[in-house]
A protein has these predicted regions:
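N-terminal helix-loop segment corresponding to the beta1-alpha1 unit
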Residues: 1-194, 198-205
Length: 205
């Protein structure tokens, strides 16, 4: 029996940090369901990255081998209802969807508050003003090191720096924050949304 058996988490993220966090939870016995839009799948498995380098498909498998993979049509009403049902039974969500898609799927912070149930949400966002948690390439680009890395190289394709230590550390942080959020929401009987480890206060009646 895993330590998190009986807990359910939804992974609505792509690439490295979010999926890694979900897989860590799955390795502890939680039921983790990675939900993807079947027409806009994780680029590590079906998209720009995987087309450039087959190694990304191996990353995808390794980052998601402790989960159920569910591919839905986010424009289909029946599929959206299936997702809503999963949200109702989940303890936490790794949220990597754009705001527009969250509105479409009724997964905004306000929508989740209306569920009137304890649920923790970790939002994965990076920007120039929030530098505590970001992908390797974001950090390299913002500091100018990425330009230095490619300076003087003439190959048609230049592989990114390896290994993605920041992304791996970020994924572990996401998993820890989500567990903390779940404990707090269950104790208080409220939904809680966190952005990169910083809480946004939500109130429920």
């Amino acid at each position: 029996m895993g330590l998190l058996e009986g807990f359910t988490f939804l992974d609505l993220s792509h690439r490295l940090p979010g999926p890694l966090a979900g897989n860590l939870l799955g390795g502890l016995g939680a039921r983790v369901i990675k939900v993807e839009d079947k027409f806009y799948q994780d680029p590590f498995n079906d998209g720009l990255f995987s087309k450039m380098d087959n190694a990304f498909k191996d990353w995808y498998k390794g980052l998601n081998n402790k989960k159920e993979i569910l591919k839905l049509d986010f424009s289909d009403q029946e599929d959206r209802r299936s997702l809503e049902a999963l949200v109702q039974t989940s303890d936490g969500i790794i949220m990597g969807l754009p705001s527009k898609v969250r509105h479409k799927l009724k997964l905004t912070n306000e929508d989740l508050e209306d569920l009137k149930k304890p649920i923790a949400v970790i939002e994965l966002k990076a920007s120039k003003s929030r530098k505590n948690f970001m992908h390797e390439l974001n950090a390299l680009a913002l500091t100018g090191l990425l330009k230095l890395y490619v300076n003087g190289r003439n190959e048609d394709f230049i592989s990114p720096p390896f290994l993605p230590f920041s992304g791996i550390a970020f994924g572990q942080k996401v998993g820890m924050d989500l567990l903390a959020g779940v404990l707090k929401s269950k104790k208080e009987g409220k939904s809680s949304t966190y952005t990169l480890g910083k809480k946004k206060k939500n109130k429920l009646n």
